[in-house]
From Swiss-Prot:
Pfam families: ATP-synt_ab, ATP-synt_ab_N, ATP-synt_VA_C. Keywords: ATP synthesis, ATP-binding, Cell inner membrane, Cell membrane, CF(1), Hydrogen ion transport, Ion transport, Membrane, Nucleotide-binding, Translocase, Transport. It is a peripheral membrane protein. It is found in: Cell inner membrane. SUPFAM superfamilies: C-terminal domain of alpha and beta subunits of F1 ATP synthase (SSF47917), N-terminal domain of alpha and beta subunits of F1 ATP synthase (SSF50615), P-loop containing nucleoside triphosphate hydrolases (SSF52540). ATP binds at G150, G151, A152, G153, V154, G155, K156, T157. GO terms for cellular component: plasma membrane; proton-transporting ATP synthase complex. InterPro entries: AAA+_ATPase (IPR003593), ATP-synt_VA_C (IPR055190), ATP_synth_F1_bsu (IPR005722), ATPase_a/bsu_AS (IPR020003), ATPase_alpha/beta_chains (IPR050053), ATPase_F1/V1/A1_a/bsu_N (IPR004100), ATPase_F1/V1/A1_a/bsu_N_sf (IPR036121), ATPase_F1/V1/A1_a/bsu_nucl-bd (IPR000194). This is ATP synthase subunit beta. NCBIfam families: atpD. It catalyses: ATP + H2O + 4 H(+)(in) = ADP + phosphate + 5 H(+)(out). One of its GO terms (molecular function) is ATP hydrolysis activity. F-type ATPases have 2 components, CF(1) - the catalytic core - and CF(0) - the membrane proton channel. CF(1) has five subunits: alpha(3), beta(3), gamma(1), delta(1), epsilon(1). CF(0) has three main subunits: a(1), b(2) and c(9-12). The alpha and beta chains form an alternating ring which encloses part of the gamma chain. CF(1) is attached to CF(0) by a central stalk formed by the gamma and epsilon chains, while a peripheral stalk is formed by the delta and b chains.
């Protein structure tokens, strides 16, 4: 094990000098012992003359020139496998939940090659989430990538938790949650909500919060991804949640200038597309299993042409847009059915009936949107009979898109519902074809399948 010494410290970037014949490789982990604290550095560049430039995975406070640095001769390695379930870990895979050692049987390096072309699975299989609006309007593909766009308080976290719960219970799948540059409070809330919903033993949590140095936030997504890859290679369907993918990019921006790179557009790192690609290309399905990822996306200043969200868009198969307008109507999940899209919504993938139903629902809701102004000024009576029918059906559809969640039982008091895709299509098709025109619209609010709406109408 070669030993070097620190020659320069600039914020999170540390230069270390090694003997010429023992220079560490790029991405190797180095270790500094400073008092009783151990700090891990990751090699980013070889500057020549035995000097390497590294990023610190923790705070570089208290480092000084001349401190000895050991080369671990391998990249950062983290625990993988079932031992990680129900635990909270940091970027290095160390437990931060005060529950003792992880007790893992295996450790994997966080830098891995994406699966080769031959290993990739080409089947376009749908992942049934049991959430009506998602299954109908923006279906997820097994091994697909989903962007969850939404402001504060419209339900990103609750939607994520419901997805984790449904995958865990209905599909006996595992989930990995990577909190990248998250608020510590949110991470804490999330952990306790997972415990209360009894799904903690099906999910591994990896956190690198906002207060951590950029090196930590830049690598924590890879730590979570590595754990997900292990489950995939065991033949499982895994869900990988990344919250927030924008902060992964931001961490790269923070260290880029310190590493001596010229900034590109809007001050982002010149390697933006490549860094995003390295992460996203590993999130994929192979012939053994699949990784389906749900990524929360923050859009700076609501500008979708900003380089960061624009680069993210290129990789997504589906976008789920949460709308404050819909949330204010009391309709949860507050997914906007007209704004959310999916590459899977294609008759060749989902079948003609599903496609026609989804497009029919969209056209009715779109027509209702256009008629709203007329209704606001002149009232319902001025509409033609045909338009009155469209409005009545649109309002039923709007309410039928809501659904009680299992993870929200605590505060809604309504038992959660999982709705199969078959029942979802049957329900919306029936409303569109006028089979339920005689039922009052409140019968459709917060129910599971259409049969429940019919039962509810009898009690009203």
């Amino acid at each position: 094990m070669a030993t070097g010494k620190i020659v320069q410290v600039i914020g999170a970037v540390v230069d270390v000098e090694f003997p010429q014949d023992a220079v560490p490789k790029v991405y190797d982990a180095l270790e500094v012992t400073n008092g009783n604290e151990r700090l891990v550095l990751e090699v980013q560049q070889q500057l020549g003359g035995g000097i390497v430039r590294t990023i610190a995975m923790g705070s570089s406070d208290g480092l000084r020139r001349g401190l000895p640095v050991a080369d671990l001769e391998h990249p950062i390695e983290v625990p993988v496998g079932k031992a990680t379930l129900g635990r909270i870990m940091n970027v290095l895979g160390q437990p931060i939940d005060m529950k003792g050692d992880i007790g893992e049987e295996e450790r994997w390096a966080i830098h891995r090659a994406a699966p080769s072309y031959e290993e990739l699975s080409s089947s376009q299989e749908l992942l049934e989430t049991g959430i009506k609006v998602i299954d109908l309007m923006c279906p997820f593909a097994k091994g697909g990538k989903v962007g969850l766009f939404g402001g504060a308080g419209v339900g990103k976290t609750v939607n994520m938790m419901e997805l984790i719960r449904n995958i865990a219970i209905e599909h006996s799948g595992y989930s990995v949650f990577a909190g990248v540059g998250e608020r510590t409070r949110e991470g804490n809330d999330f952990y306790h909500e997972m415990t209360d919903s009894n799904v903690l033993d099906k999910v591994s949590l990896v956190y690198g919060q906002m207060n951590e140095p950029p090196g930590n936030r830049l690598r924590v997504a890879l730590t979570g991804l590595t754990m997900a890859e292990k489950f995939r290679d065991e033949g499982r369907d895994v869900l990988l949640f990344v919250d927030n993918i924008y902060r992964y990019t931001l961490a790269g921006t923070e260290v880029s200038a310190l590493l001596g790179r010229m900034p590109s557009a809007v001050g982002y790192q010149p390697t933006l597309a490549e860094e995003m690609g390295v992460l996203q290309e590993r999130i994929t399905s192979t012939k053994t299993g699949s990784i389906t990822s749900v990524q929360a996306v923050y859009v700076p200043a609501d500008d979708l042409t900003d380089p960061s969200p624009a680069t993210t868009f290129a990789h997504l198969d589906a976008t789920v847009v949460l709308s404050r307008q819909i949330a204010s109507l009391g309709i949860y999940p507050a997914v906007d059915p007209l704004d959310s899209t999916s590459r899977q919504l294609d008759p060749l993938v989902v079948g003609q009936e599903h496609y026609d139903t989804a497009r029919g629902v969209q056209s009715i809701l779109q027509r209702y949107q256009e008629l709203k102004d007329i209704i606001a000024i002149l009232g319902m009576d001025e509409l033609s009979e045909e338009d009155k029918l469209v409005v009545a059906r649109a309002r039923k559809i709007q309410r039928f898109l809501s659904q009680p969640f299992f993870v929200a039982e605590v505060f809604t008091g309504a038992p959660g519902k999982y709705v199969s895709l078959k029942d979802t299509i049957r329900g919306f098709k029936g409303i569109m074809e006028g089979e339920y025109d005689h039922l009052p619209e409140q019968a459709f609010y917060m129910v599971g399948s259409i049969d429940e709406a019919v039962e509810k109408a009898k009690k009203l």
